[in-house]
Regions:
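Helix-adjacent hinge/juxtasegments
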Residues: 41, 52-82, 86
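Short beta->alpha transition motifs characteristic of CBS
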Residues: 30-37
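Residues that line or immediately flank small-molecule/substrate-binding pockets and catalytic motifs
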Residues: 37, 71, 95
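Short beta-strand scaffold segments in enzyme catalytic cores
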Residues: 19-27
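A short, polar/charged loop-to-alpha-helix boundary motif
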Residues: 39-49
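Small-residue (primarily alanine) positions within well-ordered alpha-helices
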Residues: 4, 8-11, 21, 31, ...
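Zinc-dependent deaminase
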Residues: 1-11, 78, 82-151
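Short, basic and Ser/Thr-rich N-terminal targeting/leader segments
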Residues: 15-19, 63-65
Length: 151
């Protein structure tokens, strides 16, 4: 998760929301990504989706069995949907997301019995660091916005 936090910091340095994901198989990172939504002007350019796409390319398979996805923030509905569809068996995330989290915060998709795949979820790993990174980023954005608006 420390590696994901480092990657999230690099996202913040280019004006992206500091969220990052690492896809790991047998202890080796096979894909990593941070959010690129602002850079690409693409609403689907979340760290999880980008890492899953890269993992599928690296393994030449959309079935990412025997992997773990590490994410600095609780995935949204789109991202947990991609995780389920990619058959990723394990998700580890840092901070919870009370506004958009779909792994227990506003809804809880992973244990949904009607889905054809279940994801084991471990939450709260480096949660304080993940949350602090996000809070600092948005605090800085608000401060910069206020400075631009001040005549």
């Amino acid at each position: 998760m420390q590696q994901a936090l480092t990657l999230a910091r690099s996202a913040a340095s280019i004006g992206e929301v500091p969220i990052a994901a690492l896809l790991v198989r047998d202890g080796i990172v096979i894909a990593e990504a941070h959010n690129l939504r602002e850079t690409k002007q693409d609403p689907t350019a979340h760290a999880e989706v980008i890492a899953i796409r890269e993992g599928a390319r690296q393994t030449n398979s959309w079935r990412l069995i025997d992997t773990t996805l590490y994410v600095t923030l609780e995935p949204c509905t789109m991202c947990i949907g991609a995780i389920v569809l990619a058959r990723i068996p394990r998700l580890v995330f840092g901070a919870t997301d009370p506004k958009a989290g779909a792994c227990g915060s506003i809804m809880n998709i992973p244990p949904e019995p009607r889905l054809n795949h279940r994801v084991e979820v471990v939450e709260g790993v480096c949660a304080e660091d993940s949350q602090a990174l996000l809070q600092d980023f948005f605090r800085r954005l608000r401060r910069e916005s206020a400075q631009r608006e001040t005549p």
